[in-house]
Structure formats: C-alpha cells, structure tokens
C-alpha cells in the first residue's frame, strides 16, 4: 500500500477524516513532533532548509532584476529620475478593454505596465548600475547563487556531509564566523563596491570589469592608508552644486563625515555611506575575533554568563545556567533572533524615510509611503513571532531544575508583578488618550473648538532641539551656538546635519504639536497592550493559578474538556492569536499617523494635520474618508483610470477581511452540521455523486479555524490599507 500524507506521522496518516490533511499541513514544519526524529536529524533538516530559503531569496531578487531589464524602463529613467515613472514589469491581461490598456500604458512603455513603488530603481542607480546589461548580469549572478545554495543544501543532507550536533552547538565558532564573515567581510566588500564602482559612477566615471584595475578610486591610491594620512581620504568632497552621475561639482574624497543630505538627490552623501560601512566592517571584524574557539584565546560566553551574578545576592543566581539553556533550545535562539530582527526591521522603516540613503528616493513619495508601511507590518509579524517561540521554549525546552533561581526562574516567579504593571500601563494610556480625544470631539461637535485640551509635547520638542532643531526656541545643546558640543562639531559633520535638521522639505525631525502628542500615546497604548498579551502568554505558558498543569497540554489546545470550566482560550497559542489583532491595530495607527503627517507635509498643507488630528472625527473624516474618495468611486459605468485596480483591491481587501469573521465567530458544531448536510446533498446529486472522497469531511478544529480566521483578517486588513495608501499617494503626486 502506498504511504499516505503525512509521511512524518503514521498516526495522522491513518486518520480516516480530512483532519489528516489539515493537521498534516499544520505540523509539516514542526520537525520536533515528527516520527523517528532525533536531535541530530532535527538540526540537519533546519540547516538544509536554510539553504533552500536563501536559494528562494536569490531567485526572487534575480527575478526583480530580470523583469526590469526585460520589460522596464531603467535606462530611460536613469536620464531623468524625477519625472519618469519607473516600470516594475509589463501586464498582460485578457480582461483589459481599450480604456484599461490606455490607462495602464505609461512610463513610455508600448503597452500596459505596473509602476515600481519598491525603490529598486533608486537603489540600483545609487550603487552604480546604469544599463539593462548591468541588470541582466546581476540577474544571472543571483541565479547562479540560487543554484549554488540549492546544491549546497542537498549536499549537506548526504550522509558524509551532514554536520554533527556538536558542530551546531559550537556557539563561539558560529558567532565568530557570523560576526566576522557575514557582517564584517560583507560590509568591507560593500565599502569596496561603493568606493570602486558606485562613487566613480556618481561622478561620471564608468567603472566595469574591463577598466576596474586601471581606474584609481582615489588619486593617491593606497598611499595615505600606509602613510598614516587617513584624513586625506576625506578632503575635497563633492560640492553642494554637484550633479549626481556627472563630473560637474564632483570632488575626489572617498570617506567623509559631511552630515546631512546631497542637495540635488536629497539622500545621504555616498562618501558618508562608504565611511559608515567601513566603520561597521572594522567593528564586526574585531568582534568576530572575540570568542574562544580552538586556540584557547578570547572570551568564553559560558564563563561570562556564569560570572554575571548580581551584587548583594538580591537577584538570585543571575545568568548561571543560561548558556546551556539557550544553546540547547532552538526556540530560545529563534525567539532572540526574531526579537532582534523585528526591532531592526522597524528601525529600517524609520530610517529609510528620515535618512534616505538612495538618490532621489525622498522625492518619490509613493515609494517612501510603501516602504515605510511594508517594513512596519513585517516588523509587527516578526516581533509577535519572537514571543510565540519564547512561549514554546517555556513549554518544551525549559528545565526548572537546571535554571533554579536564575534570571529565567525569577521572571516566572514574579510574573504577576510584571503582568499587572503592564496591565496598569495599558489601562492608563488607553483611558487618558481616549478621554482626551473624546473630549476634543465633543468640544468640536458643540461648536467650541477653543475648549479642546491641547498638550504640547515639550519633552520631545526639547529632545529635537538638543539635536539641533531651532524651530521651538529651546537654546539647548546643538540648538545653541555657544554650546561646547556645537563648537566641537562645527568643523566636522555639524553644518550638513544642522542644515538638514532645520530644512522643512525633508522628514528629519518633523515639527510636532498636540496632534502628534495624542497619536503618540495612542500608539503607546497599542504597543503596551500587544506586549501585555504576548508577555502574559509566554509567562503563563507553563501554568497559572487557574491551570497549574498547562504545560502538559502543549502550545496550542482549545480547552481541557467540559468538566474543567474556564480552560478555553488560555493556551500560549491563543495569546499569540489575540496579540496579532492588537499588533495589526497598532501598526495601523502608526502607518495612519506617518502617512497623514507626510501627505500634508508634501502638499505644503501641514495645518490640516495639525488642526484635524486632535479629535477622532478629524482622523475619520479628513484622513480616511477624504483620501479614500477616489477608491470609493474607483470605477463606474463611465470608464476607469490608473487607480481603478487599487479601487478593486480596496474592495477585495474588505471582502477578505470580512470573510475572516465567518471563521472567528461561528464555531465547530455549526460547520460540522453544515458539512454533513452538504455531504448528504452531494451523495444524492446525479453526476456530482460520481466524485467520491477517501477522507470523511469534518469541520476544522477550533484552533485551526481561528488560524484561518486570523489569516483572512490580517491579509484583508493589509490589502485594504495597501490599496488605500498607494492610490491616495500616487493619485496626488504621481
């Protein structure tokens, strides 16, 4: 008899119902739960899957380059980045009528195309690519890398090439290689590319493989490096009249500390970026030689952690036993990695718009909005995942004996204090912020807007002033010409930085007022509530006063039967599930704030945000309703336009979102009864009853239906906002 899906679980494979399929899919990547799994095979499978993941990423990026080279307008765009719309790829759709063909034929293309809002054109332009041939070469190289990683993944599954568990658990060696190799060497290589290829290209000098060895990136070559005159590399930078991509106004410096932005491109100086990467490379190359491996020199992480005992003995045994706990738990390691990656992704969102690194990207408003929103949503999902795996660690990998009285045990012991403090912070923020918003709404509704409670964010304004913003009149630190910090930095990076901070055309240190104060606290409410749900889920994952034996039921369980009331919805998975709703809510507020603030800034109408953002009706009417007008009337009997597809996606997003509630509100019994009725009808319908199934159809489990509901809710929510964001921004600014 042929083996049935899933091969990794004989118990599931023999299940006579459709549960076999859904549970099979749900546990396909839960390698720990598979039949015949060993620790060694677990590590090897994950290792091999990493190569597959990298292969997919390289294939995807190769596809981006290939399609732009084939169907885009990169070479035309390069000649006029501010006025030509970058094309992502062509569209072929049999449903398009003449109005659609005309609407989507733009950017100088012969037929319908999609416009790129990803910023890749600006990135490729900044790093020195100029022709379609450059793009094709890049695509082929990445395709080669993709194939290489697939072969490497397969190779490491061969018996002779499988690494041992001890190799995987050699934390010091892995850290050294990742710090030095992954971050250090790659940053150094990137500095090399910027200095040898991107910088000359920005100054009108074309460097490729043919002349790579003949063109000196700096007139004196490596002389200043070996002569100890490093400052020479920063002398004669590009002037403020430099035209990017030409020799007009260009300098010869390669590593600078100018601060601020290139006046024409409105992006960071390329020489500053090269300098930054060189510094990063140096730091990580040193960091990658810190840990003790075969040579008996350097730090032992275990020794550091064991020695890290708090003074006075008040806080227990500190970090004792942490090394083994972390090193033997993949979920702990994944939780730490996801937490770090989540924070970094959110930082990318914040820095890409405030300190744009790519030439002309700051003037492409739709791209700026799309990139900010994209990275904040990604960050939200990654951060919630960190807590999910933290909870799984507590259930599957945590050993109370091994961690007696250390920092982990003490976190669990005083979890009530942690959770109740978070709860208090959430309630405080929620009631006060909502109270202020609602008060202001009532005042406007009753015709007395002067009675609004408007609080100036003076502490935040003071911090902005300390960084050099003079608008508020605080004579402090860099905002004061007499301050020692101001005097010390005057000859270095300060002139460029101060010019940028006080320029109203960019997004660096935006001017803030009462509307910002309120929405800041609304976002703080969202962050604290999301954190409360996630932290509670992880700290209560092993057990609570209500259910002391919770860990025995695993990560996701619906309830412990009817005889034990109140055990529904309290699994660690349920906490994750609830937190995702709050995370989406929070990211929604963050992106609403960012987008509204910026479209009023870009339109030269900052007063609209300042006046309307202090009460809820202002947000609903002057941000959401006003900017969705083109989407609500997106296509009609009289024709269509370039926004029609976004109007349709706006509608479709709402539909997907609403479908989620069907799974979230009605439970298993309803669906089981419905399925049985449909099966009865199917078996009695001519022709239809020729089709049979081997598995008896049964309803999804409670946990699975929640997941399906959550996925629909999330996808619909994001689709709806993505369509709104792109249409409302591109409709205004093109």
From Swiss-Prot:
Textual note on the cofactor = P700 is a chlorophyll a/chlorophyll a' dimer, A0 is one or more chlorophyll a, A1 is one or both phylloquinones and FX is a shared 4Fe-4S iron-sulfur center.
Show the SUPFAM superfamilies listed in the entry.
Photosystem I subunits PsaA/PsaB
Q: Which PROSITE patterns match?
A: PHOTOSYSTEM_I_PSAAB
Per UniProt, what is the membrane topology? Answer: Multi-pass membrane protein
Give the record's GO biological process terms.
photosynthesis
Q: What transmembrane ranges does the database entry give? A: 46-69, 135-158, 175-199, 273-291, 330-353, 369-395, 417-439, 517-535, 575-596, 643-665, 707-727
InterPro entries attached to this UniProt entry: PSI_PsaA/B (IPR001280), PSI_PsaA/B_CS (IPR020586), PSI_PsaA/B_sf (IPR036408), PSI_PsaB (IPR006244)
Q: Which reaction does it catalyse?
A: reduced [plastocyanin] + hnu + oxidized [2Fe-2S]-[ferredoxin] = oxidized [plastocyanin] + reduced [2Fe-2S]-[ferredoxin]
Keywords linked to the UniProt accession:
4Fe-4S, Chlorophyll, Chloroplast, Chromophore, Electron transport, Iron, Iron-sulfur, Magnesium, Membrane, Metal-binding, Oxidoreductase, Photosynthesis, Photosystem I, Plastid, Thylakoid, Transmembrane, Transmembrane helix, Transport
Task: Name its cellular compartments.
Answer: Plastid, Chloroplast thylakoid membrane
- EC number of the protein: 1.97.1.12
Residues that, per the record, bind [4Fe-4S] cluster: 559, 568
Its function, per the record, reads: PsaA and PsaB bind P700, the primary electron donor of photosystem I (PSI), as well as the electron acceptors A0, A1 and FX. PSI is a plastocyanin-ferredoxin oxidoreductase, converting photonic excitation into a charge separation, which transfers an electron from the donor P700 chlorophyll pair to the spectroscopically characterized acceptors A0, A1, FX, FA and FB in turn. Oxidized P700 is reduced on the lumenal side of the thylakoid membrane by plastocyanin.
- Family label: Belongs to the PsaA/PsaB family.
Q: Please state what the protein is called.
A: Photosystem I P700 chlorophyll a apoprotein A2
Q: Which gene encodes it?
A: psaB
